Regions:
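Glycan-recognition and catalytic cores of secretory/periplasmic carbohydrate-active enzymes
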Residues: 1-197
Length: 197
């Protein structure tokens, strides 16, 4: 099972490690990983959920795409390889297609039909507070290129917290639901803290 989302997290971890120890092996590993993500995107037309037994999934999730965008931009910040910056911009542009007018995210796109979808059967196939974390690559790219449109989009995404926030301050997993999920609540808080910073 190959899982692109965790690959994005790994690229972010490499930046953390490189900041501690300027080991050139970290850069070599990061280049191989970023090249794999670029090839995956070019082959499938998006950041797919995963590959099971050599069979790729044809669904691209906004959340996974944002984690890969963040990882690629993190790696760019240590590698200074413009190819990674260009791919990070491409992923952020792809993310913009998932954003609804109210700042919430459509959860997934079927790459076969080129249609956005949502399903009430699985928590991650619905709009949720977890998508507030998708603001992070918008803020990060803004820090790199100072494009104020990116800053505004990141803020608009974070402002969706009020759609999910309960009277006690917690965040509901989905719109107009009472279910609280610690995992997704942490994602929402992470996106808000990143935006605040």
């Amino acid at each position: 099972f190959l899982y692109p989302e965790i690959t994005g997290y790994f690229l972010s971890s490499l930046r953390f490690l490189y900041d501690i120890e300027k080991n050139p092996l970290i850069l070599d590993l990061g280049e191989k990983i970023s090249n794999w993500l670029i090839q995956l995107f070019d082959t499938h037309g998006g950041i797919i959920q995963g590959i099971y037994s050599s069979v790729p999934q044809n669904l691209s999730y906004s959340f996974d795409t944002s984690i890969c965008a963040k990882g690629i931009l993190d790696f760019y910040q240590i590698s200074k390889n413009e190819k990674n910056l260009d791919f990070g911009k491409k992923l952020v542009s792809e993310l913009e297609l998932f954003i609804e007018n109210d700042g919430t995210f459509r959860p997934l796109k079927n790459l076969r039909s080129n249609q956005f979808e949502e399903s009430k059967k699985l928590w991650y196939k619905q709009k949720g507070c977890l998508h507030i974390k998708c603001a992070m690559p918008f803020f990060q790219l803004y820090e790199i290129n100072k494009n104020k449109d990116l800053l505004k989009k990141g803020c608009d995404i974070c402002d969706t917290y009020s759609k999910f926030q309960n009277p006690d301050g917690s965040f509901s997993l989905h719109l107009e639901k009472n279910t609280i999920n610690l995992h997704t609540l942490c994602y929402a808080v992470e996106g808000l803290l990143y935006g605040y910073n």
